[in-house]
Structures are given as C-alpha cells and as structure tokens.
C-alpha cells in the first residue's frame, strides 16, 4: 500500500550514505534507501542482509520509491535529525522525525551495543582483546596494533 517514502535531511547530512541504489549488502550499509526498505519489510534493520553479495532486483525496484530531499534546517555537526514521510497509494501520509538516533554523537552506542555489533563478524575472545586494548590505553598505537593483530585493521 506504500506509494513512496521521502527521507528528509538537512543539507549534506547524508554524506556518509553515498549509495542511493546499492547492489550489494556492503553498499547497503551506506544507503538510507536499503535501511528504510529493511525497516518497512521486516520491522527492523536486519544485520545479516549487509553481508549478502547481491541485493535482489525486486528489492532494488522497491528502493527506487524511496527518495531523499534536503529541506530540513542545517544543524550543528554533532546533531542528527531525519524526518521520514510515508505516502500511501490512497494519498494518506505518515511522518516521523528522529533526533539523535542511537549511535550518533549525542546518543552514542553503549559498550554492550558495540560488543553486539562486533559479534556479527568477530569471535568473543577477539572482541574482549579489542575492548581491553581500547579501554586501558591512553595511546593510540597499542590499540591500532591490537586491531591489526585481530585482522580488523588492514593499514
């Protein structure tokens, strides 16, 4: 019953979301269209869908009904605001505004949130060593060395 979805941003606020028509799950991590599709299709973001090699054509067709507009006022660099408008085929509209979503500078992830995200790709002992290196050092080098050793950082 959804005709289209409009995602409203302040100017330039979607710079990290560089893919409007992602073809892989990895590209989908940087696509508001793919995230909105997941929320509408499944009720929440499905992390495993970011691992798929090819996004199905039917999903890409659906994402073409999701558009971006830049009609919100500019905000401070630490602020995040997004408005989503869903327009149904019968003309009804529903709008929701999100200020500072989880993971944004003013609403950071908790250590447990970070553990869960890392757990999607790393083993528990790797996560423990990374967090230990991060928490108990004032120097960047030991932390980066741990990331390299765990195969997370490749530079």
Regions inferred by a protein language model and the residue ranges of each:
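Terminal-appendage/accessory-domain detector
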Residues: 1-155
């Amino acid at each position: 019953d959804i005709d289209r979805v409009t995602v409203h941003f302040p100017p330039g606020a979607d710079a990290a979301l560089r893919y409007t028509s992602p073809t892989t799950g990895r590209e989908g991590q940087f696509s508001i269209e793919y995230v909105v599709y997941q929320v509408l299709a499944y009720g929440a973001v499905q992390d495993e869908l970011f691992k798929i090699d090819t996004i199905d054509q039917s999903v890409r067709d659906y994402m073409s009904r999701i558009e971006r507009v830049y009609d919100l006022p500019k905000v401070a660099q630490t602020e995040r605001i997004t408005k989503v408008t869903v327009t149904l085929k019968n003309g009804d509209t529903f709008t929701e505004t999100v200020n500072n979503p989880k993971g944004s500078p003013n609403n950071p992830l908790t250590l447990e949130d970070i553990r869960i995200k890392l757990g999607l790709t790393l083993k528990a002992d790797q996560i423990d060593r990374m967090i230990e290196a991060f928490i108990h050092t004032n120097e960047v080098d030991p932390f980066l060395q741990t990331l390299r050793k765990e195969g997370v950082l490749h530079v």
